[in-house]
Regions:
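Single, function-defining residue in the core of a domain
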Residues: 1-42, 76-78, 92, 105, ...
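Active-site-proximal, Lys/Arg-enriched surface segment
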Residues: 59-123, 128
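Alpha-helix boundary/capping residues
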Residues: 52, 69, 264-267
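A structured, charge-rich N-terminal accessory region that forms the first stable segment of a protein
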Residues: 22, 28-67
């Protein structure tokens, strides 16, 4: 690791502001390993330890941190949520995306904040598959209720937006979000039965008129067992392999098909954000059987990710000539066409100039609707 410098002090201030309740040695360990994750881009404990002078001592220190029972995973998740609330902008929509990520028998439920075409995990829970058996929807609703309620209390219901995939299409979630007054667009399964104009029909039996790609179905009653009045649309979309598929989207607002697709199309940023955590920050390389230790390591990765996005917000999204010049320095080192995300660009830049961490501050307001400028 690099010696103590102003960049370390900035990160230390950020961790202190985020975890004021943690002991000093806990905050120092979190700071050191968050910085190691950013430097080494790995979640492998051995590789992280190699970045320190004494590898054996660093390995033991990381193990103590990840197995420290006083650092409860739920407290770390709460700290991540509170830090995100501090960094939310004062204006504009605040979009939340829900997603599960699975590694063997370990399941991670993540509530992410959409930032441009990417997302930052702001709240999470990790579970063993055996614990989730028969309780998955109930546990998910409890986590979502806590995260979404706190965000809406901060920004107001009019600014909130929630998107989720088919696994979250549940009457209990629809009821909660509608009762909270927050707008949502959730993809539902094609086998779902919906009552339109008094006639119950399964969505996959409906057809598009002519060669159109959008069809608003209007307001219908979702789920015959516990009817929910929702606006439903269907749209043709290509998947990652270029094959045509159909999105059946349910919303509690009278969105047109185009509006519903545009809103839901931001949700893949959540998947992209998880890929950033897994590959750019190396969480995919983590190998831990104990679910609480795995959750604590994800907390370190989530902190590292929000640090990177905060720096990118201050340095790359400023919208001036200097920001474009700095971004061009990253692009100039790549061959041919390349698509840079906010995270990959900032990570590449930090590798070139580690002292950029001097610009970190715990109160940086995230620019949720901004994306990288196009440079050549």
């Amino acid at each position: 690791m690099r010696s103590q410098d102003s960049a370390t002090t900035r990160l230390d201030d950020y961790i202190v502001d985020m975890l004021p309740w943690a002991h000093g040695h806990q905050r120092k360990a979190i700071r050191d390993f968050v910085r190691a994750i950013i430097d080494q881009q790995t979640g492998c404990q051995a590789q992280l330890a190699r970045s320190f002078g004494n590898q054996e001592a660093a390995t033991k220190r990381l193990s103590r941190l990840l197995h420290n029972e006083r650092l409860e995973p739920r407290h770390l998740a709460d700290a991540g949520l509170l830090q995100a609330l501090v960094q939310l902008p004062a204006h504009g929509p605040v979009r939340l995306a829900l997603d599960w990520t699975i590694a063997g028998d370990q399941h991670l439920l993540v509530v992410s904040l959409i930032v441009g075409r990417r997302a930052v995990p702001i709240y999470w829970r990790a579970y063993d598959a055996a614990v989730l058996k028969g309780r998955m929807q109930r546990y998910a609703l409890a986590v979502i209720r806590r995260a979404v309620t706190r965000v809406i209390q901060k920004v107001g219901r009019r600014r909130g937006r929630v998107t989720a995939d088919r696994g979250f299409a549940d009457v209990a979630l629809f009821t909660f979000l509608s009762g909270l007054g927050v707008a949502f667009v959730i993809r539902v399964k094609k086998s779902t039965k919906i009552c339109l104009a008094g006639v119950g029909q399964k969505l996959h039996t409906l057809r598009f008129p002519g060669n159109t790609r959008r069809r608003p179905l209007g307001q219908g009653l979702y789920c015959a067992g516990a009817p929910q009045p929702l606006w439903v649309t269907m749209s043709r979309k290509r998947d990652r392999q270029g094959k045509w598929g159909i999105w059946y989207l349910a919303a509690n607002r009278p969105y047109t098909a185009t509006q519903a697709v545009a809103e839901y199309a931001r949700r893949p940023g959540c998947e992209a954000g998880l890929r950033d955590a897994q590959w750019w920050l190396g969480f995919a390389q983590a190998r831990m059987k104990q679910i609480t230790a795995w959750s604590r390591l994800f907390a370190l990765v989530a902190i590292a990710l929000v640090v990177v996005v905060s720096l990118a917000t201050r340095l790359l999204l400023r919208g001036d000539k200097q920001g474009r010049t700095l971004l061009r320095r990253v692009v100039s080192r790549r061959r041919g066409r390349c698509e840079l995300s906010l995270v990959s660009a900032m990570m590449s830049w930090l590798q070139q100039d580690p002292e950029l961490s001097d610009h970190l501050a715990p109160r940086i307001k995230l620019k949720l609707d901004r994306d990288l400028a196009k440079v050549s």
